[in-house]
Design a protein with these regions (language model features):
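N-terminal export signals
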Residues: 7-28
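Long, structured stretches of catalytic cores involved in phosphate-ester chemistry, encompassing
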Residues: 3, 23-100, 104-687
């Protein structure tokens, strides 16, 4: 049943969009001649539901401050059967961007759309797809992507995705693309200042006239700076082609605002300051350039009205770590990104914001560097991280005054701090409510941050390999800051899944610049391993990953180098034993370094290390495709070579590997079970 036109008008007003209502099909009534040069960022659509979708373009004008465009939506690419026609304003106040909500559409239907100015100068033609009805039993297909730093590479993955989708059977074509953040990188390098990083060429993206410089990075501090970056990114032809082919469903990660920022604090390396106005500017630019059903701060249809804020210190926090300073609250609430999408019978997608409401980084105190130290190449004792994550609530409210590593003792910097939260109290309550209300076969949590533990077992290192011994029976963590080390919060969520008997729970995420597949579990051995769902991380589209950094930065004389890299003959890429370390442990790595015998190395796998992992590739790039049915969830990783230069091939270039992870729907009380199969290529040490 379609919503009424009156209800549709209220929805359009709530999300700050112009609107059009579909009617009977008729021929086009406008003059139109394609002039892509006048629409330099292309066209896009976003957040489809069963009867509507948001359309977007940017058409800058040299004269005046406000102009009108016409948008048409048709059932055919030739616009013989036009079902919607409306005028929409573009203005200098919105950087000449347009958002149009088209309603009255048919469910699970493909449409074509285009924009035109008063002189008949037209945009390229875009294609979009509405969602199926909530009771539609058809299979759901979508892709999830993240981390597209075109300052340091090219978007060959999108071209591969388009090439394959155009040739896929209709029932297997993608319905939408879920973008899990780092759509832009606010840390911009200039090619005339730094020509390369690692083995990558630095490409021109934007110039930040009003920003701040940290090292080689230029960082925006105003909306004009963020807009310049979006315009530079959206000049990429492969990104334009992808946005013109599918509706995108997007949520920001950190780089849409600030690299190491949280709430409205700007932080990039040594640069840290209150950034309430910067957070508002980042939200405004995101709102202007990504079509999404997100709530703006004003009731206007045409623009984001930024709330007046001042950059003042945030000194008072509530019991959950939320800064109570009024400008901070105004800034982080200037745009609410968390939302849901129902897509047929088989998908309830719940999307969360991992940066606007999170507490301060609980692992950043400099004194903690003494725990493990540089000798262990970034390994940090898991028990110590759990103490820090738990804050004042650790051990039933009795956290230790000190944290120990062998004979080293440091004061517990989180003893009086709240337990770490990534979601914040209000959003977490909303998320838990949505999870319990979800009725689709699969309840998929779309969040930008990975949730699978990244740990190793240095307690099994041979005696004497390092100057200091690692504590017995103590696992190590190799990253922090995402849900992989947010034990308190994720346990709360996973316990809800188990206690509410929720089946078909799965997480899709990004940010880590690597491929991961495994299980959502609150604890790992020696705790009780009880997975309640599936968990996947998609690799970066472009951005450099862990292995690329280690190839250039890992000390060559470290006795622990074989745990991460095994060097080969000159000119050949090293073997990435870091994948083995996370999946199988130090004994497997050292055996592989000695013998190059992968089967023998796997025979030494530590069964208590990573029962939650089925696959990990810290050197992967590409995208993931998901297929959901009544019976199973199928997640396919498509990995491409490092996208350092643009491929000249229509298919985006070669594939490194294609691997699929399949799980049948489980009943309440049962454990989910993944089956992994390599369809083509070589996954190396990832399994």
């Amino acid at each position: 049943m379609k919503i009424s036109r009156r209800t549709f008008l209220r929805v359009a007003a709530a999300i700050g969009a112009s609107l059009a209502w579909a009617g009977p099909a008729r021929g086009s009534r406008i003059r139109w001649q394609e002039r892509r040069d006048l629409y330099p960022q292309g066209v896009a659509s976003g957040d489809p539901d069963q009867h509507s979708v948001i359309l977007w373009t940017r058409r800058p004008f040299a004269q005046g401050t406000r102009q009108l465009l016409t948008v048409e939506v048709a059932e055919d690419e030739e616009f013989i059967r036009v079902v919607a026609h409306a005028e929409t304003p573009v203005a200098s106040a919105t950087d000449w961007t347009a958002r149009v909500l088209i309603g009255g559409l048919e469910p699970a239907h493909t449409y074509w759309y285009r924009f035109s100015d008063a002189d008949g100068n037209g945009s390229r033609v875009g294609r979009t797809i509405t969602a199926p009805r909530p009771d539609d039993p058809r299979t759901v297909n979508f892709a999830f992507v993240s981390c597209q730093d075109v300052n340091e590479g090219k978007l060959n993955a999108y071209r591969r995705m388009i090439y394959e989708d155009e040739r896929a059977p209709a029932a297997e074509q993608l319905g939408f693309v879920l973008h899990l953040g780092d759509f832009i990188y606010e840390v911009v390098e200039y090619p005339d200042e730094v020509k390369t990083r690692y083995d990558r060429t630095i490409y021109e993206v934007a110039r930040i006239a009003d920003g701040h410089k940290v090292g080689n990075f230029h960082i925006p501090l105003t909306v004009e700076g963020y807009r310049a970056i979006y315009k530079g990114y959206l000049a990429d032809p492969d990104l334009q082609d992808a946005r013109a082919r599918w509706p995108f469903v997007a949520i920001w990660d950190n780089h849409e605002f600030s690299w190491q920022g949280w709430q409205s604090i700007v932080k990039a390396g040594s640069f840290e300051q209150p950034g309430q106005s910067v957070k508002v500017a980042a939200n405004q630019a995101w709102f202007e350039y990504l079509p999404a059903r997100v709530s703006p701060p004003s009731g206007t249809l045409e623009r984001f009205d930024p709330p007046p804020v001042q950059n003042v210190p945030i000194t008072e926090f509530d019991r959950d770590g939320l800064g109570l300073e009024p400008n901070n609250l105004a800034a982080i609430n200037s745009l609410k990104g968390y939302r849901t999408l129902r897509y047929g019978r088989h998908l309830d997608l719940i999307i969360t914001d991992q940066h606007s409401y999170r507490s301060a980084d609980c692992f950043s105190d400099p004194s903690l560097d003494k725990l493990g130290g540089s000798e262990f190449l970034g390994m940090f004792p898991e028990p110590a991280m759990q103490v820090l994550d738990g804050g004042r609530g650790f051990n039933g409210g009795n956290p230790p005054p000190e944290i120990h590593f062998n004979d080293t003792h440091v004061p517990n910097p989180q003893r009086s701090a709240p337990p770490q939260t990534i979601l914040g109290a209000e959003q977490k309550a909303w998320f838990k409510e949505q999870l319990q209300r979800a009725t689709a076969t699969w309840k998929v949590w779309g969040n930008s941050l990975g949730a699978l533990d990244s740990r190793a077992d240095p307690q099994n290192l041979p005696a004497g390999l390092t100057k200091e011994s690692w504590p017995a029976n103590t696992f190590a963590m190799l990253s922090g800051g995402d849900f992989g080390t947010a034990w308190v919060e994720r346990t709360e969520i996973y316990n809800l899944v188990r206690e509410a008997k929720i089946t078909g729970f799965a997480i899709v995420s990004g940010d880590r610049h690597s491929f991961w597949a495994g299980y959502a579990a609150a604890e790992l051995p020696p705790g009780k391993f009880e997975p309640v769902g599936l968990s996947f991380v998609g690799a970066s589209l472009v951005s450099p990953g862990t292995m690329e950094a280690y190839e250039h930065r890992l000390p060559k004389d470290s006795p622990l180098r074989p745990l991460f890299l095994v060097d080969k003959e000159a000119g050949a890429r090293p073997d990435w034993t870091f994948n083995l370390l996370l999946r199988h442990g130090v004994r497997a790595c050292l055996e592989y370094a000695r013998s190059s015998d992968l089967q023998r190395a796997r025979s030494l796998s530590n069964p208590d290390l990573a029962p939650h992992l089925e696959f990990v590739d810290l050197g992967g790039h590409g995208y993931a495709k998901v297929r959901l049915s009544a019976a199973e969830m199928r997640t396919e990783f498509v990995c491409i070579p490092r996208p350092i230069t643009r491929s000249e091939s229509p298919d985006g270039g070669p594939i490194r590997y294609r691997v699929v992870h399949t799980a049948s729907l489980w009943k309440s009380g049962e454990r989910p079970q993944l089956k992994t199969a390599v369809l083509e290529g070589d996954v190396g040490l990832a399994i």
